[in-house]
């Protein structure tokens, strides 16, 4: 029987709120089975860009990453946010190690084509080195990945953290029973964005299409759900989208929290 591996992506406003992030990391440290954390950090990068007078361009909510912005997000994601998370986890007793996809050649990506939209130094995941990530886990470390990858030729690339989490969970499912969790400030996928209690308990391919047709899945959630379905279809045991504070309760008690994605 394969050993469970928990792959958790933390994002949304939780990263920007020090108290919420600290609470989440305490809960994360309570998970004693092998685990991997993937984090974003867009809001902090945007705030620093304004202070440093680095113009930012967003297209449909996605950041255009020019050369100066790439330097900035590498410093913010791989430096400030990564090291703060690692320091907090170390204080909690976890032997955490902050990584990017370039470290240990963990996540390789292809630069996104300039047509139809040129997003600059943005990469789409091409390969995950599950063998090297497994070596890190076997050595007793807790990998903490920021959403920076590389192209194998020395170029760093900005990569969607949700996609990176899905790709890592999929790659690790060969050796582990992979469980993927998308944690943010909401209780799950909401049928009504104005009603925090309108959590959809389960989404499958059939009701997903229906919910989209009815306009009940807001635009920003669709890429996350697409990544979730991709993971399920490629061998990940289970995918949950839930409130960050409910993570340890879901894993430790097996009770239903948030939205479960099923095939």
Model-derived features: positions:
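C-terminal catalytic "cap/lid" subdomain
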Residues: 1-263
């Amino acid at each position: 029987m394969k050993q469970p591996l928990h792959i958790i992506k933390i994002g949304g406003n939780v990263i920007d709120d020090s108290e919420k992030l600290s609470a989440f990391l305490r809960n994360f440290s309570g998970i004693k089975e092998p685990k991997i954390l993937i984090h974003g950090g867009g809001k902090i990068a945007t705030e620093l860009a304004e202070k440093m007078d680095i113009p930012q361009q967003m297209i449909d909510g996605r950041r255009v990453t020019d050369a100066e912005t790439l330097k900035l997000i590498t410093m913010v994601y791989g430096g400030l946010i990564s090291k703060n998370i690692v320091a907090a986890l170390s204080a909690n007793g976890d032997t955490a190690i902050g990584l990017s996809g370039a470290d240990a050649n963990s996540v390789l990506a292809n630069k996104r084509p300039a047509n139809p939209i040129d997003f600059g130094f943005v990469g789409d995941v091409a390969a995950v080195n599950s063998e090297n990530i497994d070596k890190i886990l076997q050595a007793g470390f807790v990998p903490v990945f920021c959403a920076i990858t590389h192209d194998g030729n020395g170029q760093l690339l900005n990569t969607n953290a949700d996609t990176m989490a899905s790709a890592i969970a999929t790659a690790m499912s060969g050796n582990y029973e992979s469980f993927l969790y998308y944690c943010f400030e909401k209780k799950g996928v909401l049928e009504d964005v104005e009603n925090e209690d309108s959590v959809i308990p389960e989404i499958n391919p059939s009701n997903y299409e229906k919910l989209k047709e009815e306009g009940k899945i807001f635009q920003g959630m669709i890429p996350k759900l697409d990544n979730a379905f991709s993971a399920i279809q490629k061998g990940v045991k289970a995918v949950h989208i839930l409130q960050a504070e409910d993570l340890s309760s879901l894993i430790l008690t097996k009770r239903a929290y948030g939205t479960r994605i099923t095939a």
